[in-house]
């Protein structure tokens, strides 16, 4: 990667599903050997806290240690499944357990409270809960470039207004209280 950076073919690179320890080790190696360090990470983060990973080897950065690490280093985060597998689209209902991966990874009382709060703020701001979920990511205290994987074009249409939604510190805290 370093040769491509030096040749100007890329301007930044990083890791996906890497632990923060592995990321730091790679950057220590880069520094010790005069190479370009990693500047971005693609691990999971969403307003809905994940309780399991969809596949072996996946990494989250929702824990306090990872959040502090991101704030301190200002590493750009490209969170995959930033819409929590459609949790905020209306697909997630406590009584509907037909999507076993959604249930395994995201169903919890805490996340359904977050969904209710996202719905409340969405109604007040004239957007959908998916837009609030996107705005929450964009208001983190480090660079975030959320990756969404909509199943339908309607999910893109309801999410993108989140690019313009402003959330106060109080609203950010309310969503995760």
Predicted regions and their residues:
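Beta/alpha (TIM)-barrel catalytic core signal, keyed to glycine-rich beta->alpha loops juxtaposed to Asp/Glu
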Residues: 1-176
């Amino acid at each position: 990667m370093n040769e491509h950076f030096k040749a100007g073919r890329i301007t930044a690179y990083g890791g996906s599903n890497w632990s923060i320890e592995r990321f730091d080790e790679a950057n220590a190696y880069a520094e010790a050997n005069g190479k370009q360090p990693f500047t971005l990470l693609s691990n999971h983060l969403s307003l809905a806290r994940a309780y399991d990973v969809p596949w072996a080897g996946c990494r989250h950065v929702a824990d306090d240690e990872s959040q502090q690490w991101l704030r301190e280093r200002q590493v750009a985060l490209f969170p995959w499944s930033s819409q929590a597998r459609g949790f905020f689209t209306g697909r997630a209902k406590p009584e509907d357990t037909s999507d076993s991966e959604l249930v395994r990874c995201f169903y919890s009382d805490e996340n359904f409270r977050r969904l209710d709060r996202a719905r409340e703020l969405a109604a007040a701001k004239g957007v959908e809960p998916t837009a609030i979920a996107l705005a929450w990511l964009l208001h983190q205290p480090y660079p975030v470039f959320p990756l969404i994987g909509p199943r339908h074009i309607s999910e893109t249409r309801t999410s993108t207004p989140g690019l313009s939604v402003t959330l106060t510190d109080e609203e950010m805290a309310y969503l995760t209280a």
